[in-house]
Amino acid sequence: MKTAVFGRDSGEPGSPCGAPPSLTFTPPATLVPPTHHHSRSTNRGGVSGTGGGGSGGLQGAPGAGGPRASHSSRRTSRLHNNVSALGVLSLGADVLPEYKLQPTRIHHCTIVHYSPFKAVWDWIILLLVIYTAVFTPYVAAFLLRELQDTAKKSRFTEPLEIVDLIVDIMFIVDIIINFRTTYVNENDEACQVVSDPGKIATHYFKGWFIIDMVAAVPFDLLLVSTNSDETTTLIGLLKTARLLRLVRVARKLDRYSEYGAAVLLLLMATFALIAHWLACIWYAIGSAELSHKEYTWLHQLSKQLAQPYTSTNGTIPTGGPTLKSRYVTSLYFTLSTITSIGFGNVSATTDSEKIFTIIMMILGSLMYASVFGNVSAIIQRLYSGTARYHTEMSRLREFIRFHQIPNPLRQRLEEYFQHAWSYTNGIDMNLVLKGFPDCLQADICLHLNRNLLSGCAAFAGSTPGCLRALSMRFRTTHSPPGDTLVHRGDILTGLYFIARGSVEILNDDNTVMGILGKDDIFGENPLLYDEVGKSSCNVRALTYCDLHKILRDDLLDVLDMYPEFAETFCKNLTITYNLRDDAQSLRKKFDRHKLLRMSSSMNKDRYTTPPDGDHGNAAVRRSAESVSRCDSNPIDRRQSAGSRSSSRCSPPHAALTATRSEATPLLRRSTNHHEEDDALFDDIRAFARGNTVTMSPTVAGNSVSPTTAIHNDGIHSQQLSDRSDDYEERRANMFGRRLESIESQMERMQNKFNSDMETLIKLVKEQSIIRNNGSSNEEPNARYRPNNYISSAIRLPNGGGGGVVDEMRVSRLSSHEPPTPTQETDTIL
């Protein structure tokens, strides 16, 4: 058997999902909150007017143009184009979301807070703050005394002094820039950008001005004339005020807390920075007690390194360990203390050192728990996907073990779970979108199904609203190789669109009927059938497949909401393989023919009943009532039963006079049998109700007389009522004769069938004997071949969509000679 391959490229002409050249995909409109003056929407390509959906650019109202408006439009457009690129780099916490961006009237010499210049400037200030956080405590504890001694000789000769001066200047400039930088008014519902200089100054004074001003004061320049030790210590303490800027930096860096690696890096940097500060304080305590105490930790270090301090006449000791050794030892002691290790080779000896060590232990325990607890949480979050995968897999295996799932089903379950997890990473899209509004869900679904809706010709010409409604009802399914998507006999509840992979269509004996690939469609067209059909084939995945499925009811609901699109959809939809089982329509047609055959036999009995035409008419009417009840619902059947019991008291009041020849076999009727059947059913129902019946002349094969009118006759009805008892008796006799006739006919058919089967078995045995003997003379035995005797044909129409058995004939078998072409055949209903 040849295999039909229906897969084709999406760009091939005639492909069911090949989009025509005129099909364009319309993206969803961008959300814009209402404002007092203008209402514009921003797309990724530029700033466009409201009603537009244009190609970018700012579209203003007529009369509002001019060079000034054009310059403002170009400036706003340039700024907006850089917002997406600088959104991650910007440190401002008040960066507007892109869909809320509004073109504002920028004051002269005012800096927009989301401009590229402001983003770069914030990063420069961040680096200077980090430099200040590291070197300010170090200089105040280790180098301030040496720098003061050098300053007595000459100013600004040391590199650190020059760098500190530059940092002070940059902080002062940052204050000036903050007075000219816009901000977002969070108290306003519209979240407008404020560019008025007065409002900006008021907002800055209420915010970070005091902290920035204290951090920018050059205290070492203000106290340069004093040379006492107390002044030097005061300068060191005041210079640490620059660390207040870290609060502002920490607030801005909070926007990166969603990135696990960034948070891990920030936590480790924070831990190291605090240890650095504690090391500077630890050295400052030992250095302050060095002149009047001889058993500080610095003295112990000098003895261990054999580098003692020297002092004359109570002055500050000189010499001792190098600066590098002092800093490394201080940092070593603080880290061993806050991590609760404490080797003991460096220990506190004085009371001040012991008090600070106690404070450092308490602080270290809290910091250790918080920092490393967060580190554990971050690492666990990094591997949360793997943990969830193993958890779900364990649950699946427990389910298989508890319910004793057989191995084939177990393998299919595990393969599907692994494939679905690798495709979705364990994320349930329905659960994610559940908490969002319908409009946003529609936009997301439209984005996820954009390739299907824009590439399939069936959706060409649909409105954006119709596409949004369709995208909300599509469901994506994933299938591993070998998984059966549809079984034979399943209800066809949906329409399938193949997005990736290939499937095969199989019949009952696993014969491949077709192979479908990307952009193919299978199922049934719900617009062509009133009732849900059943699948006539099995559909099995050949490779890993991704399919878009829409339920029949959901599709019909959308087409009901958009009736103008229904005709276009039905016209453009090309189903690659129709799975509908046409045997359903065949059975319905057979039931209809059986009813018509009953009516045909009833008409025959009506004209051949000899005793009394009135009683024959009554029998016809009673039989017509039973035929009318065959296609009614249970309620109508109960009502008909009630009317039948009441009609026994009053015989029919109508007479039917018509002539007709013997009925022609039903399966030999002409091509116009549908119109004849409908007319016959209408006549039967009308006659059962006692109304006037008009019988139309039939087509070839029947000899019913032309139009015959039936009128009620009061006199004749009175005569019939007088003979009601005789009518009941004749009616019982008529049905008894009918039953005997049917039984005898069935017995003849059974005998004939048995005889034919015996003859067929005999011929098959003779054929096998001849074949075993190896006889080469075939002409004498040709008459005994079963293929020559059996002439059975089931002819189906050549049209698509299955069909109905038009004629079924079984030739009469003979035990002696095959039938001739002119021999009469029996028709079996």
Curated annotation (Swiss-Prot):
InterPro entries: cNMP-bd_dom, cNMP-bd_dom_sf, Ion_trans_dom, K_chnl_volt-dep_EAG/ELK/ERG, K_chnl_volt-dep_ERG, KCNH_animal-type, RmlC-like_jellyroll. GO terms for molecular function: inward rectifier potassium channel activity. Residues 145-158, 225-234, 283-327, 349-354 are extracellular. It is found in: Cell membrane. Glycans are attached at N313. The potassium channel is composed of a homo- or heterotetrameric complex. Interacts with dnj-1; dnj-1 chaperone promotes tetramerization. This is Potassium voltage-gated channel unc-103.
